[in-house]
Amino acid sequence: MLALVVALASHRGIGNANALPWPRPLAADMAWFRTLSQSIPLISPDRIALAPSASNAVVMGRRTWDSIPSRFRPLANRINVVLSRGPARSTENTFFIQTFEALDSLPLPPSSMTFVIGGRDVYSLALESGRPHLIFATEVFESPECDVFFPHIDWASYEKRDITRDVSRLIDRTLASAFYSPETATFTENGTSFKMFLYTKPETR
């Protein structure tokens, strides 16, 4: 199954000038992405749990790949898949493909998850593919200047679930203690507040 992972502003902006639109990276959100993308989500009516997995894939566009500092590429403990029109050589843990459909030809274990992590065009391809999917969204309560926005979708066709409390339990405890407020079930870093949500279609439950 596909899972889209995105951090977006109140107006659905996801980027500005080839960078995230918030002044500083959000440590708790980054920790959640790292933990989630190395796990299989176990979703029950009352909680979210994670089962570790070293065979998941992260799918991204070439600009997203290039935006990752070289010392962190490829993303560890995950199969990295980069959609790129230009020529590039695949390696043991990184595959360069030219179409979204080429995912089906990659040696991904059937039990693995495929996490789509941006940018906008890759999100669009995932949504247009018709594949069952989840959306893990970190929603930032700000509307900063953005020049890239998440694709338009009918959000009302998804069931929205606040998983912020679950995330506070699943990420590094030091980060949770520093940035999570149990009273409001909200993370706040450097004056920026945000929550995590899971969007599901009824047919993917």
From Swiss-Prot:
EC number annotated for this UniProt entry: 1.5.1.3
Pathway stated in the Swiss-Prot or TrEMBL entry: Cofactor biosynthesis; tetrahydrofolate biosynthesis; 5,6,7,8-tetrahydrofolate from 7,8-dihydrofolate: step 1/1
SUPFAM superfamilies linked to this entry: Dihydrofolate reductase-like (SSF53597)
Gene Ontology molecular-function annotations: dihydrofolate reductase activity; NADP binding
Gene3D superfamilies cross-referenced by the UniProt entry: Dihydrofolate Reductase, subunit A
Domain DHFR intervals: 1-201
CDD domains in alphabetical order: DHFR
Keyword presence, ATP-binding: no
Reaction equations catalysed: (6S)-5,6,7,8-tetrahydrofolate + NADP(+) = 7,8-dihydrofolate + NADPH + H(+)
Binding positions (substrate): D29, M30, A31, W32, F33, R34, R78
Keywords from the UniProt entry: NADP, One-carbon metabolism, Oxidoreductase
Top-level class of the enzyme under EC nomenclature: oxidoreductase
Single GO BP term: one-carbon metabolic process
A GO term from the CC aspect: mitochondrion
Protein biosynthesis found in the keyword field: no
Record PANTHER family: DIHYDROFOLATE REDUCTASE
Similarity comment text for this entry: Belongs to the dihydrofolate reductase family.
Role description: Key enzyme in folate metabolism. Catalyzes an essential reaction for de novo glycine and purine synthesis, and for DNA precursor synthesis.
Protein name: Dihydrofolate reductase
Organism of this sequence: Encephalitozoon cuniculi (strain GB-M1)
The gene coding this protein: DHFR-1
